[in-house]
Design a protein with these regions (language model features):
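Acidic, metal/ion-coordinating pockets
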Residues: 22-191
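Bacterial N-terminal signal peptides
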Residues: 10-18
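Positively charged, low-complexity intrinsically disordered regions
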Residues: 6-7, 19, 23-25
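Bacterial N-terminal signal peptides that target proteins for export
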Residues: 1-9
Length: 191
């Protein structure tokens, strides 16, 4: 009886492991967040870029590398270049989509607006609004087609608390009037 149980257990385990090799994802999303100028020490931007490249070898898969904010500030590399070096690294790594986190504003809105067009994958935010025009500062989302016509939307949402967790004067004009907002309200309905 013991042989029979062991046999079936080993067989089930082998079949389960065999199935793992056949798992296929049509849309692969690699995600970073709060890296503050550097992907974790165990990985690094170079290895992240290589991982994306390796995944892209499967022609059936669409691979997207996305960042959910706080990438360009936090270490001397970012501070000394006011974010430029990290944007350059993100381009080499192949980022496809980024959301401005509260620390993307640490060099001021004007600086972020200088850096944003340089990020090949683009910055996206559905709720960072120029209050003078009522329009979003960045595109709100990015559509990605995969698997012969399926679509996925990557939607950028910057935390409305950025207005107070960053430096409020960065979002004001010379007269102290807010010229940028985050569709903030107590209910979240403005998003």
């Amino acid at each position: 009886m013991a042989f029979s149980r062991r046999y079936w257990l080993v067989l089930a385990l082998c079949l389960a492991l065999q199935g793992l090799g056949q798992v296929r994802a049509d849309l692969v999303v690699l995600h970073t967040n709060d890296v503050h100028c550097g992907v974790e020490n165990q990985l690094g931007y170079a290895q992240l870029a290589q991982y994306k490249k390796d995944l892209m070898k499967n022609p059936d898969d669409t691979v997207q590398l996305v960042d959910a904010g706080d990438a360009i500030q936090g270490e001397p590399l970012g501070s000394l270049t006011r974010g430029q070096a990290v944007i350059d690294i993100m381009n080499v790594a192949g980022y496809d989509f980024a959301i401005p986190g509260n620390h993307e504003f640490d060099y001021g809105v004007a600086r972020l607006l200088e850096l944003a067009p340089q990020l090949a994958g683009g910055y996206y935010s559905c709720n960072l609004v120029d209050l003078r025009t009522g329009k979003t500062v960045f595109p709100p989302y990015k559509m990605v087609a995969y698997d012969g016509g399926k679509k996925a939307a990557f939607i950028g949402v910057t935390t409305p608390q950025t207005l107070i967790s960053s430096t409020p004067r960065y979002f004001q004009d010379d007269k102290g009037q807010f010229i940028y907002g985050f569709s903030e309200d107590a209910t979240g309905q403005k998003l």
